[in-house]
Structure formats: structure tokens, C-alpha cells
Amino acid sequence: MKIKFKQSNIKVAIASAIMVGSVSFSSAGYAATLTVNAVIGEACVIDASTTMSFSGYNATTTHAAGNGGVNLVKSANIGSLCNAGTTALINMNKGLNGAGADAAPTRKLAISGAAADAPKLNYNLYKDDGYNFVFGIGGSGGVTDAGGLSLVADGNSNNVTVYGSIPKGQLVPTGTYTDTINVTITY
């Protein structure tokens, strides 16, 4: 069987095929948004690696009891870094040899390795340079506790000055007296 095509029909078919092949489809566009957020929580770090060194205590002269003697005073800095806006509280414990109430502990320096009943050197740590406000322990550990030192962070490193005092007139044996204080920051 022989099929005959008219030349004009072939031309129309070719032109139609070219047209169909060159037809373009427009793509549909959709837009959406992506929300990006970050939640920054309260966070702090503390650096209490400094040493408060009471050197030169002499209870028979400079630091003698009575009107002529004075307490031996020193200071040290504790560094803290908290996210901006964080409310924090710095507290200190009584130390290894401390006694007294949490709000106003009596801290004691002792000769390392000495018997438990060996003489100790009383001292304390204060929040102010007038030596009026003892650095308490902060019983509940909350950020509003009166025993510690409260701060609202600005995002920068902060130094908190701790003031120490050894009361005058303590006649104790010679030696190197030490104590270890745990410093905490609660936020």
C-alpha cells in the first residue's frame, strides 16, 4: 500500500512541528520567607584564680591590740563575664576553716597540716572598701540573696573587688597560714 502525501500538507505538518517544538512554557514562581532567630540565654563564667596575700602581719607592733594597732587589709579581684542583661550573684563559702552564720561567717587561716585544734588566724572578706559588709555565703543561692554581691551584666568582662581584713591583736605561732574559698556565680 502506498500512501500519498500532498506537498502542502507536509509543509503544514513541518511548520506545526516547528511551532510546537518552540513553544515555551512560563514557569510559575512562588515566594516564601525564612525566619531566622537565636535565643541567647543567661550565662556566666567566673575567674577567681587570683590570690589575696596577707604578708607582714605582726601582732606585736603594727597590728598590735589596742589603740596603736591597725587591721591588716588587702584586696583582690574576681573576674566575671556574663551575657548582657544577665542578673547574677557572686557568693563565697566560709572556707576550709570557717565558722559562724552563713550571712556573716568568721573565716580562719590555718597552718597546712596542723592539728584541727591548732591556733588559727581570723580574717574576713568584705564587699566594700569600708570593711562594713561581710561577703556572706548567700544561704539560698538565689540571685537576690543579701550575702553575696549582685550584678547586672553588660556583656563586658567585669572585675569585682574583694576586700580582706585580718583583725589586729591576734598572737598566733609563726608559719604560713592559708585558706581556700569557693567562689560561685549564680544566674
Predicted regions: what they are:
Residues 131-155:
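Extracellular beta-sheet repeat scaffolds used for adhesion and glycan interaction
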Residues 30-117, 150-187:
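N-terminal small/polar-rich segments of proteins
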Residues 93-95, 124-128, 136-138:
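Predominantly extracellular/luminal cell-surface or secreted proteins
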Residues 1-15:
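Bacterial Sec-dependent N-terminal signal peptides
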Residues 21-26:
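N-terminal signal peptide c-region/cleavage motif recognized by signal peptidases
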Residues 129-131, 187:
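Solvent-exposed strand-loop boundary residues in beta-sheet-rich modules
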